From Swiss-Prot:
Gene source species: Actinobacillus pleuropneumoniae serotype 3 (strain JL03)
GO BP field: protein folding
Protein name: Protein GrpE
Keyword entries, A-Z: Chaperone, Cytoplasm, Stress response
Pfam families, alphabetized: GrpE
Compartments, as annotated in UniProt: Cytoplasm
Transmembrane listed as a keyword: no
Gene Ontology CC: cytosol
Amino acid sequence: MTAQNENAQAQAEQVEVANEAQLEQTAEVQQEQPVEAELAAAYARINELETYIAEADNREKDIQLRAQAEIQNIRRRAEQDVEKAHKFALEKFSKELLTVVDNLERGLNALDTAVTDEKTQALVDGVEMTHKEFISTLAKFGVEAVGVVGEAFNPEVHEAISMQPAEGIEANHISVVLQKGYTLQGRVLRPAMVMVAG
């Protein structure tokens, strides 16, 4: 019996060793499955975070581009405002000077018919020089006269008082200038009052 007992005992040990091996193998498989699941979850989280970081980078770049564009727009508007301020700072002053020019021209027109002696002619010459210098000074600052007989009528710079037929002048052209108009850097200070050939 001893041999049978030994045999049975050996078989029992083999079964026990086999069971232990099977339990270890099952435990390893069970341990591997949660590890693989955790690893897959970790990779998914990594991908999610990388996507979030990429989106955040894109948002940041977009915000920076918009901020730079806004800064450029602000600079451009400020430069335009300064340019307009310089360009048209003289507008009100120039408008006031136009009445002086008008009066000088009226005086010259009246004196042309009244000149009878040298003293009066010297006075006329002095007023003419003053008028020319005045017009020259205005031109230096961008003030220019508009409204010349024969020029095409332009409603942006001319104000038509009436239309009448005129010999030698095409239709829709200025036939008579009642009051000169002026522009400052291309901007109308005062429209020319004119009669237009019809």
